[in-house]
Curated annotation (Swiss-Prot):
Molecular-function annotations in GO: glutathione peroxidase activity
Subcellular location: Secreted
Assigned keywords, A-Z: Oxidoreductase, Peroxidase, Secreted, Signal
Protein name: Epididymal secretory glutathione peroxidase
UniProt entry tagged with the keyword tRNA processing: no
Homology family: Belongs to the glutathione peroxidase family.
Keyword Cytoplasm found: no
Catalytic residues (UniProt): C73
Reactions listed under catalytic activity: 2 glutathione + H2O2 = glutathione disulfide + 2 H2O
Signal peptide: 1-21
Amino acid sequence: MTAWLGASYVLPILLVSFVQTNAKPEKTKMDCYKDVKGTIYEYEALTLNGNERIQFKQYPRKHVLFVNVATYCGLTAQYPELNSLQEELKPLGLVVLGFPCNQFGKQGPGENSEILPGLKYVRPGRGYVPNFQLFEKGDVNGEKEQKVFTFLKLSCPHPSEVLGSFRHISWDPVKVHDIRWNFEKFLVGPDGVPVLRWFHRTPISTVKEDILVYLKQLKMK
């Protein structure tokens, strides 16, 4: 009996070790599928202050970067870097769009009206103000996910095979293309079709380099 109990404890440990050892490392990015049907121009979203419903068809011939953001996350430091990215690549047609979400570690709590003060005075703080458009807070996974994120996720494979810890998954249903954490990014081309998807921990400097390579390749076509 004692031997059986010992084996029952050891087996799960061995299985966990096997899974961790054999898990493939995350890629920093993935190319989106070549046969995507539809464009972002079919979708819209309400601005953070609730005053305007923006149709994404107002971004024709622009390179649009969709980012699901959160205020109280270890990656919130990417906010100022996104400002720099917007400023530096705006002359090349880049538009950054931010979508606050509270689905990952409950790191985007509060009302829409609390988001900008939280960014300005808490994280990243020091008077920070985003220079790109933020939209109202909403889900990016699950039954109530925003339709544009349904489209983006189905258009691009995820850079990681790991869904993450079940204690962080609060939505249903769970799908393989789901966003894993705050600050994942999708780049949409000038025709409204998604082209690239980045893992959330990919540095903004790498995202910038990837976008510049993409723009150079696009120019050569």
